[in-house]
Amino acid sequence: MGVALITPFKSDGSVDYNALVRLVEYQVQNGVDFLCVLGTTAETPTLTEEEKRQIKKVVIERVNGRVPILLGISSNCTQTVLNTLKNEDFTGVDAVLVAVPYYNKPSQEGIYQHYKAIAEATDLPVVLYNVPGRTGVNMTAETTLRLARDFKNIVAIKEASGNITQMDDIIKNKPENFDVISGDDGITFPLITLGAVGVISVIGNAFPREFSRMTRLALAGDYNNALTIHHQFTELFKLLFVDGNPAGVKAMLSMMGMIENLSLIHISEPTRLGMIS
């Protein structure tokens, strides 16, 4: 299991790097397999370039090689991603995560060409990220499989389309060296039973040990015990996303004393009471 790290903030709106260090250590000590830095859950589009660099630096230094780092470098502009690959320091980064271009609503051929340019510009492993609920366009199974077959350094997809049929199609027809990773906590268990290799988790920010255990049990074929843990989280899966991500998980972390309780972490009162219960 990987965790899509949140970005903790202070009351003045600046990044709380001390809280970030605590959160990273909490993840590593509780058995996560890798960390996803500067993904959707990190509120990356709202961060400055300097904040992104500093977050990357702080996380890599704290991890110190103990778990792999998957770094988000998404943009709806292909050239921006290429410039990032050319100009930024990727020391300590094990792979990059790149979402389908958002807002532009490209065609399937446009999506293919976006990833083609990126794959050809780096030797780093590239993880595709399909999240049509945020980008406005779905990358089809056909496009995903075409990319997986054409580029050896396109090694996986974080699939958050919510379309189990599409995900199953990818799993059944993918090359052997290409992995499917759940991008949605709530369907991680069923997706693993179909052949996915894990999850890039939101809920893992708050419950890394428990959700890692569920994932490992499922991967080992111990479906009964994995399902028991999955069911323990079912209500929380819903509550954490009622008021949007990452508001829910950040509210949960603030209740746990992991990050500062800020007014901008806005959740409804019914959601808050549900989390407490």
Residue ranges and their predicted role:
Residues A121, R134-F237:
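Catalytic alpha/beta core domains of metabolic enzymes, predominantly
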Residues V3, E25, E61, F189, ...:
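Generic alpha-helical structural context detector
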Residues V3, F9-G136:
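Active-site beta->alpha loop and helix N-cap motifs at the rims of alpha/beta catalytic domains
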Residues I265-S277:
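Single conserved hydrophobic/aromatic residue that forms the stacking wall/gate
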Residues V28, I60, A119, D168, ...:
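Structural signal for well-ordered, non-membrane alpha-helices
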Residues L20, K52, K56, V81, ...:
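A general structural signal for well-ordered alpha-helical segments in protein cores
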Residues N224-I259:
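Shared catalytic-loop signature of beta/alpha-barrel
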